[in-house]
């Protein structure tokens, strides 16, 4: 890891904006598509620009190399499972609440990084910062945290999905010596391979009559909230570590609530 620079904070903010925009787009996509189809097509559309980038930059994609099991595992844990859980959960809650729930990620990241990394141990300053950040989000958006018996299961799925993002980040650190573009392309390829037969068999998307806005949101989710976002995420992970990258979750609710209000007219 390196010392954090102003560029790193800028990239973290861009990543937060891209990921915050994912929640209202997932909501729009659910108007026409099932959660498995959303997860599959999101990964599929995300893989295309990353693979093209590897081709242009002449970067070898190692999805089927001797390290294939790392890429497959990260693809399942970091893409397949959380994408499905979040898409399923967003069906019954507002997109801005989903964004707020993601603020729990730094707590999980700090705890797991302490036990499973050598250079990101919890100390007083770090733990205080994480707790202050989380408390600030809860205080600012307490009026939006409307969880009841009708949506508590959906809220739990989103929280559970956010945990898989952290676990996937830990696994990614194990192959941080590999090129960012290669890692991103490889896990997207494996995510596509795994989800394609499952989504086709269980949801049969060819029987759908999707709305245009749902399809456009799905394409956006793939190219921007998956392909570009994961390139950024792995770059930040590699250079700044898991705990710093997880702090993106403190910015996501701010952008998520604003975008939910502007696009879906959700209450602030």
List the model feature ranges, each with a label.
Residues 1-37, 88, 147-174, 193, ...:
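Glycine-/small-residue-enriched transmembrane alpha-helix faces in small-molecule transporters
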Residues 12, 66-73, 121-133, 154-155, ...:
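Cytoplasmic-side transmembrane-helix entry/capping segments in multi-pass membrane proteins
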Residues 18, 22-23, 51-102, 135, ...:
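Specific transmembrane alpha-helical segments of multi-pass solute transporters/efflux pumps
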Residues 21, 25-28, 32, 46-64, ...:
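Membrane-interface helix-cap regions at the ends of transmembrane helices
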Residues 31-48, 88-106, 151-164, 211-226:
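Structural signature of hydrophobic alpha-helical transmembrane segments
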Residues 39-41, 79, 83, 97-104, ...:
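Helix-helix packing/entry segments at the starts of transmembrane helices
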Residues 50, 109-111, 115-117, 147-203, ...:
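Transmembrane alpha-helical segments that form core, pore/gating elements
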Residues 50, 72, 103-104, 112, ...:
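Hydrophobic transmembrane alpha-helices of multi-pass small-molecule transport proteins
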């Amino acid at each position: 890891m390196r010392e954090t620079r102003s560029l790193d904070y800028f990239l973290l903010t861009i990543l937060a904006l891209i990921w915050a925009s994912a929640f209202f787009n997932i909501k729009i996509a659910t108007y026409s598509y099932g959660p498995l189809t959303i997860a599959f097509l999101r990964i599929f559309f995300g893989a295309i620009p990353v693979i093209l980038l590897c081709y242009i930059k002449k970067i070898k994609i190692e999805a089927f190399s001797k390290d294939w099991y790392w890429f497959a595992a990260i693809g399942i844990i970091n893409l397949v499972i959380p994408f499905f859980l979040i898409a399923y959960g967003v069906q019954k809650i507002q997109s801005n609440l989903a964004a707020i729930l993601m603020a729990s990620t730094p707590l999980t990241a700090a705890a797991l990084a302490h036990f499973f990394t050598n250079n990101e141990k919890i100390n007083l300053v770090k733990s205080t910062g994480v707790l202050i950040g989380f408390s600030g989000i809860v205080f600012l958006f307490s009026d939006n945290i409307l969880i009841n018996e009708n949506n508590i299961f959906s809220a739990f799925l989103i929280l559970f999905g956010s945990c898989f993002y952290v676990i996937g980040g830990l696994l990614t650190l194990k192959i941080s010596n590999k090129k960012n573009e290669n890692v991103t392309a490889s896990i997207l390829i494996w995510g596509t391979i795994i989800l394609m037969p499952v989504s086709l068999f269980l949801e049969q998307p060819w029987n759908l009559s999707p709305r245009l806005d749902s399809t456009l949101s799905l394409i956006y989710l793939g190219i921007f909230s998956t392909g570009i976002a994961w390139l950024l995420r792995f770059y930040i992970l590699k250079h700044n570590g898991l705990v710093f990258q997880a702090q993106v979750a403190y910015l996501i609710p701010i952008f998520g609530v604003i975008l939910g209000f502007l696009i879906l007219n959700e209450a602030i």
